[in-house]
């Protein structure tokens, strides 16, 4: 997996501000090419942690450099599943991502035969299991993504954040989940490479927002305690 590192800043905004911001973003940025007709896609992620929940506690403690793993797919489509390693170093985030099959994803969860494959991705998943990483929590949300080529900018608005303990089929579209964000809230994320272009910065400055170290993973675990 090849890592891509970039700036990542997160905010909590109101749903009202989210609607206004989507309107403004459409005038300057392009929607991600993979969105549905309404400009969004549905994301399901399964986060892993070890038996001591190290990834969770490092985030809560504010450890500067930390790592977590997840399996992710979109719109409940199992034809494109990714295994992702997310790393954080202050305001910088990195992501390494590889495509895996549904068979391999399910084998990781059950310890199935596919993990004995010699393929690199299978070996990576087998190594995670051997090191004690296990499914921790299911995270669902709807994302409205926008891109701007200069600075490789990506602005996303996440709504309908919901969670469940992982006790079900990862691909069950009727999994019983509970809401995580306070009513009327959304998450705004801004990612870019070396700099944030002035037009995008000016657009975002017009939004009432509260910067915070939002972690969907830790928020979801907290809700389930």
Task: Give short role names for the model-derived ranges.
Residues 1-225:
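Phosphate-end processing signature that detects enzymes handling 5′-triphosphorylated RNA
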């Amino acid at each position: 997996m090849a890592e891509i590192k970039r700036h990542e800043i997160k905010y909590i905004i109101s749903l009202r501000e989210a609607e206004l911001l989507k309107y403004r973003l459409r005038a300057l940025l392009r929607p991600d090419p993979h969105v549905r007709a309404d400009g969004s896609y549905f994301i399901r992620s399964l986060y892993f942690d070890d038996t001591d929940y190290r990834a969770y506690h490092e985030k809560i403690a504010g450890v500067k450099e930390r790592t977590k793993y997840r399996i992710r797919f979109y719109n409940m489509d199992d034809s494109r599943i990714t295994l992702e390693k997310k790393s954080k170093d202050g305001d910088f985030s990195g992501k390494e991502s590889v495509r895996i099959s549904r068979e391999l994803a399910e084998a990781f969860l059950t310890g199935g035969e596919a993990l004995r494959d010699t393929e690199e991705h299978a070996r990576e998943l087998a190594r995670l299991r051997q090191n004690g990483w296990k499914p921790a929590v299911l995270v669902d949300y709807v994302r409205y993504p926008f891109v701007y080529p200069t600075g490789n900018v990506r602005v996303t608005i996440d709504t309908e954040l919901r969670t469940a303990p992982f006790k079900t089929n990862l691909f069950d579209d009727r999994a019983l989940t509970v809401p995580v964000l306070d009513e009327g809230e959304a998450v705004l994320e801004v990612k870019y490479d070396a700099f944030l272009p002035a037009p995008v910065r000016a657009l975002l400055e017009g939004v009432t927002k509260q910067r915070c170290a939002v972690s969907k993973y830790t928020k979801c675990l907290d809700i389930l305690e």
